[in-house]
Amino acid sequence: MATTFSASVSTLATSLATPTRISFQKPALVSRTNLSFNLRRSIPTRLSVSCAAKPETIEKVSKIVKKQLSLKDDQKVVAETKFADLGADSLDTVEIVMGLEEEFDIEMAEEKAQKIATVEEAAELIEELVLLKK
């Protein structure tokens, strides 16, 4: 779905008033006497994902997930890893949550625990609960 933004720019030069219609689809430079508008829009070329959780929390959660799912040591588990992609079913997810609660000495509300699908989501929720506990 593409959206085109447009704007009208009016400049008065001596006795002429000329409205100019500019489409923002492509970069443009409009100049009139001493007046210029650079209409170049910066468009991100790459989307990057960043974790709000601390790396050490992500690492602890990853280790617990590996332990609960009996994964091999060389199995890669990172922040974006989904429990379902590791073969976890709903019972496995409950066991993961129980392991996390024990390790971090917290209690997760059932509604929030059911929404956890990735290591990152678990780590972020844990950090939130640890802060609330203090």
From Swiss-Prot:
It is found in: Plastid, Chloroplast. SUPFAM superfamilies: ACP-like (SSF47336). Residues 1-51 form a transit peptide. One of its GO terms (molecular function) is phosphopantetheine binding. Its main location: plastid. The modification O-(pantetheine 4'-phosphoryl)serine is found at S90. Gene3D superfamilies: ACP-like (1.10.1200.10). Pfam families: PP-binding (PF00550). Pathway: Lipid metabolism; fatty acid biosynthesis. Residues 55-130 form the Carrier domain. GO terms for cellular component: chloroplast. The keyword Transit peptide applies. Seed. InterPro entries: ACP, ACP-like_sf, ACP_chloroplastic, PKS_PP-bd, PP-bd_ACP, Ppantetheine_attach_site. Keywords: Chloroplast, Fatty acid biosynthesis, Fatty acid metabolism, Lipid biosynthesis, Lipid metabolism, Phosphopantetheine, Phosphoprotein, Plastid, Transit peptide. 4'-phosphopantetheine is transferred from CoA to a specific serine of apo-ACP by acpS. This modification is essential for activity because fatty acids are bound in thioester linkage to the sulfhydryl of the prosthetic group. In rape seeds ACP is coded by two multigene families. There are probably a total of 35 genes. The sequence shown is that of ACL1.A4. Belongs to the acyl carrier protein (ACP) family. Carrier of the growing fatty acid chain in fatty acid biosynthesis. HAMAP family: Acyl_carrier (MF_01217). This is Acyl carrier protein, chloroplastic. The gene is ACL1.A3.
